[in-house]
Amino acid sequence: MKQTTKFNKRLTGIVMMVVLGVSLISCVGNETEPLTFAYLADTHIGTAIGANDLRNSVRDINKMDNIDFMILAGDATEYDLAGELDTVKAILAELKVPYHIIPGNHELKWSASGGEKFKKLFGDDKFNVAYKGYRFIGVNQGPLMRMGEGFIAREDINWVHSALKKMWPKKQPVFFVTHYPIDHTVTNSYEFLDIIKHYNVQAIMHGHGHRNLLSNYSDVPGIMGRSNLSRGGPGGYNIVTIKNDTMTWVERHPVEKVNLEPWLVLPLKDFEYTDSHKALKPDMSVNKQYPEVKVDWSYDSEYSITAAVTVVNNRVIFGNRSGKVIALSLDRGKELWSYQTGGPIFTEPAVMDSFVYVTSTDSSLYCINLKNGKKVWKYKTKAAIVAHPAIYDNKVYFGGSDGKFRAVNAKTGKLVWDFMKISTYVETKPLIAKGKVIFGAWDTYLYALDAENGNMQWMWKGEKSGLLYSPAVVHPVYANGKVFIVAPDRVMSAINIEDGKTVWRSNTFKVRENIGLSEDASTVYAKTMWDIVCAISTEGDKPETRWSTEANYGFEIDPSIPVERDGNVYFATQFGFVYSLDATDGSITWQHRIGSNLLNTPVVIDNMIVVSGMDGKVTKLVTAN
């Protein structure tokens, strides 16, 4: 029977009954033996109360004899640093029942390991298990290492598709576990729904919103579970029971040992879904307004790309999450060579002469021959590297996740010096100017070191405390005696390069993590978090706005950088747009949409724009001369 679901919600007391209006199917689960599991989300270890609240829930679960397993639906920690994931692992090791866990945005965006430590500790960042006739598939939505909306990585989309195709029986009832809701906050949610709606999906269970809530994701029931935290009230989780083809959700307070009345009772049914998620698909109509912009070629690497490409000698060089460094021909987009490192790559390659320099989460800096892709040398550190390398005066400068910043001889791969006073990890690409190497870290500080010997010159800190306000992602730029940065405190700062003193700070525009420099160094450009691109003078001791343009791109937190070339400013967004503005007044000259997902900083050569995306694709646009 074909079923188009409609929700008719009736609240009786605090019990929500959801009637979906089709007959039960005989293959749904076990009619006599109930399945019961504990459902936790958003434990946020690293906060003052997170670890204790999780311990309380684990102790409580261990005292019950009817719990078959436990699920933790992401944001287990505040960050992937300072041993927070180890704490989660140690607490969950006390469970007497199996558990299944996925990462959330906190473990993947703020990650010293690029998400690799989570996989190492818990075996994977996804799961596919079956209990008593029901299948549970868990997959994360990032965003992986870059600030943006949620996104299901291309490699994970493929994994989900493969898991479902292998499933037997084909009509087995399936529950998906995600961290984000599968709605507009996940930029490629339509791709996910296109796949799963061919199967008997009973519900998508998730966290992120820190409350209990029933939703509807293109006709698929969506169930948000509360945060485990006791912030603002009792800590708690949900006990979920499936019995007689009905799923019941009950909130449990472990310290008080109290079960509330069921807040959701969901009949399980034989679902056959219609295509009702067209509104989530990207609107590409803007491309018809600017027919002078065309796609010349697109290359699909099949794994997430989180950094800009480098274009040199008619080659397009980039790394991706598979750990490969890939070289394409600029003219046709054909693969010329690839080199496999030992871990995912989240950084932009640097090039000097005939050599490519790439950092990898396998803890190494690689030097690769530009012509043939052969390794020249490898420099190994003691932790993952998620920071971009920069080259100056025959040295490769890069930060690490081991509390160090290094300079390595670009020809020999030998250490020149290291700086060992960083308390967390480095993610940015350093600026080298006026004999200094300048970079931020996830410890709230901007550092200036002597480029020759690594000695500290100065440290700078913004006005807000807390790691999340660190100037750690922005690539600093230099002009007219000042270093310019932006940070998650939404303030642009100009800092004297000689002594690290603040020249000015401005919150006129709500900036975040991107800033670019004009070709003549007279202006810095930044995308704001809402619609506006601003151009600020680099001259003088006070901020002066040259122009601001309402580009109408909506909410924007993609850290990709505005780039000026030949009188135009180019930038990309988290929703797959590339813009070109007139550098003199900020007027829009054209825009083009490549897809729905986050794009990295565009590289512009003449009338060619090469841009990589989180979807694993590299696209070359060309414009009419």
Question: What residue spans do the PLM features occupy?
Answer:
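N-terminal active-site segment of His-dependent metallophosphoesterases
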Residues: C27-T87
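Acidic/histidine-rich helix-loop elements
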Residues: F37-N56, T77-Y79, L108-L121, P143-R154
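Metal-dependent catalytic neighborhoods of phosphoester/phosphodiester hydrolases
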Residues: G50-D53, G74-L92, L108-K120, T185-E191, ...
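His/acidic metal-ligating clusters that form di-metal
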Residues: N62-F69, G148-P221
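Binuclear metal-dependent phosphoesterase catalytic core
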Residues: V220-D283
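Extracytoplasmic beta-rich repeat domains
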Residues: Y290-T310, L336-M352, W377-Y392, S401, ...
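Short loop/turn segments that connect beta-strands within beta-propeller blades
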Residues: S329-G333, N369-G373, N409-G413, D450-N453, ...
